[in-house]
């Protein structure tokens, strides 16, 4: 029996280093190839030894798919392709292809040039890795080989993020990557059609969270920022270069303009220009409002937000700084945090999820004394706020996507075990489907029922709609047609269309039953008696007496003939097509009971 096997190499009951191995009908696909931001040793990369114990990875894997440019989804890609050794195709969207190498190089500089880490990929490896990338458009069906095809759907979350459908024959898996079911200030909501996959693999970062009103969150955020700068404090907002950063920049830019504020707002050097360039380049990936107003006003050209210089961190007076990366695990955001942490006037606002092991996660867990590099202790006196502007789906959004895609089974990744367990039970109760949540290295095997996809001709559907009411969503309805196979594809069409397409002439199959009737009259008179009897009995049917003496009821033909041996007996020949078998049988039984006596 065919089956689908799924093994998380990363993000199994965990957030970070997303990497899922899927085997479907003999094809092997790796979904994402991320890095764990909470580790600085080999644990940061997925354990690729699970893929194959012998032979080259390229011989085993048919392709790699990257859902978006966040490092926990693509950070291990150069390591995997250039150091572990994979030469096959890597699929991602055009924005992901453009932005991914920039973020990889930024992180490499921090890890190697500043921290001096060994066993890390080089700049050349990033370039060589990106040469293997095949960029895809949304809703484009890409044929990886003769049997394997993939298709990308809009995921929201960040610029270029996509959900992917992987299909082999009639079997399919949908992998969501990270997605957001609610539109924000610069991106639209995730969308997928009712594709009914065998398996939906969905992220579950916020498995137990239902977010409050976005407007309330925005109001609280602006209030906290405003109050801090009013009392002379500095606000640090750690963000990743693209995505949430633009969302909050648009929000603050609008507020500063409305309130006519003069307090400086800064953004990590160079990243604003890069972000601006990519949002212009991929404007079709943004939401409808930004696309509409883009010609008159580019929302990403900020008047109040300037490029940050590291010397500004020591300037007196209030300021707001957006700095990367978003989890305070390295880079400029961590440097500024160390400088400002000792002043209670200052505030750090964490707008997104932080994985375990990062400074961001530690301060959100309430730690106020941190051991930094070189065993230095840092006392945190500044105010710490968590405000979820995360571009991940919450529990309500995850349930919405499951309802939209209608999968046969669901598998949860990219979440914390306890929260995943709660969501797993909820999905099983509400949708009556099996839901799994494997740990890293654990394999889930799903048997699948082979099915044959059948297309239905538009003409047949239109005819059905004219003849009857529209089908109800949850009530099955019979559809009559002719099943034809052409070029290895099955289609249900009308019989007329089937004959035309296959070049066949129409033949009619009729059944004839003989009914013996005691009657001494002539054949014409017997036929007239039959007509009168049926006309009075069958009020809802069209009964006709034809000039040649025969009688018809709908398509059923009745003829009276003399008996060859008994002059006092007539033979009624009742003839019908297979479509009217039910009516033909009824008339035969009725006539076998005889005709009413004619008045004398």
From Swiss-Prot:
Its EC number is 3.1.27.-. The RNA endonuclease activity is inhibited by BRAT1 that forms hyrogen bond and hydrophobic interactions with the active site. One of its GO terms (molecular function) is RNA endonuclease activity. It is found in: Nucleus; Cytoplasm. A motif (HXHXDH motif) lies at residues 68-73. Its main location: nucleus. InterPro entries: Beta_Casp (IPR022712), INTS11-like_MBL-fold (IPR041897), IntS11_C (IPR048662), MBL (IPR050698), Metallo-B-lactamas (IPR001279), RibonucZ/Hydroxyglut_hydro (IPR036866), RMMBL (IPR011108). This is Integrator complex subunit 11. The lineage of its organism: Eukaryota, Metazoa, Chordata, Craniata, Vertebrata.
